[in-house]
Amino acid sequence: MSATATLANAKQSSAPQTAAPKLSERIGRIEVSATMAVTAAAAKLRAEGAKLVDFGAGEPHFATPRHIKDAAIAAIEANFSRYTVVSGIAEVRKAIVERHACDFGSSYTPEEAVFTTGGKLALFNAIEVLIDHGDEVILPVPYWVSYKDIIQYAGGKVVYLETAESENFRVTAEAIESAITPRTKAIILNSPSNPSGAVISRADLERIVRLAHSRGIYLMLDECYAYLIFNEAPFSGASVTEAKEHIIVLGSLSKTYAMTGWRAGFALGPKPIIAAMSKLQSQSTSSTAAMVQKAAIAALTGSQECVCEMRADYIHLRDTIVAGLRSIPGITCTMPEGAFYAYPNVSGLLKKSGIPTPAELTTRLLHDAGVVVVPGEAFGTQEHIRLSYAVSHKDVEEGLARLRAFVAKF
């Protein structure tokens, strides 16, 4: 070896080794969002030229309605692009409470509302300001992927409440009551449900609201899909106005108005909780983008015909995808009562194919069939996959054809 090479090697061996960063204990409590991970994997394959049918992302295939876009454009042209108050301008908070009162019979003031950068931030802020280390939060299974992680990030303990597939995964007041302990601080209800499409009956929801109120337990109502109830008029637990001191409504414009990328959400609740959420928000995102607030006002105060039209299309898409899934050997599927997800049981297919888990099935479907789905493990179950049917009718038919061809190999 030459002297030059020896010197180079010596320098290399004496160079300091980069140590792995020491991350906080808190960040170790959570995982990457499974739905975001699936979206990233699909995007990578698309970039490589793959033609995929994407049942993964829970976002409408519709464009944002014209009048909503026009409101944002007008705001930009008027230079409405500066900071606003953290909780949102008075007009957007007024629009939120008036729309909710009109549609659901609730009773809130603008001071009991905060506008957030997406519904997920409303959930995050609510949990952060209410949950302390060791507090129990009742969470029905299956659950949306982020609930568990956000609770654990706050130091809370998740109390999983199993539901029965034979009963369409519905949550009942009796089941909730059986899960309450002296350490129960909050209950999270998502109706219609992501991922199952289950809808809590109006009677059970009202009983749960009164139960939580009588026990001094906070009830977080995730109403992101509240306008996508298919068999009856939308309803909210916040209509039980005498219990409002223990209710936090978590809302979003993303699904209702096809505004997922706008990041427009809100929370309604008791003034002290909303003030605390605004305080936390003041140290993180601050206000939502000014022009988004103007777009939200247009969405909430303008014609709601677009909401009705999208809901009607989702019903047709639901009927098509459920019938198609039920026709595939090894797959059974409950009938979703709302939202825009099918949550089929694939245990028969796993057994037939020898594929060990829904997660592995998801990988196989992505690479072998070009079909994007989300594994049930992300939602707390071991025999299911989730398909979002908020896609075009053509994509539903193509995706079902690919699924049939994949299953026919076994």
Q: Where are the regions a protein language model picked out?
A:
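Conserved N-terminal alpha-helix of the aminotransferase class I/II PLP-enzyme fold
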Residues: Y83-T116
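PLP-dependent class I/II
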Residues: M1-L23, I27, E31-S33, V38-V53, ...
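A glycine-/small-polar-enriched, mobile loop at the entrance of the PLP active site in fold-type I
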Residues: G56-H61, A75-R93
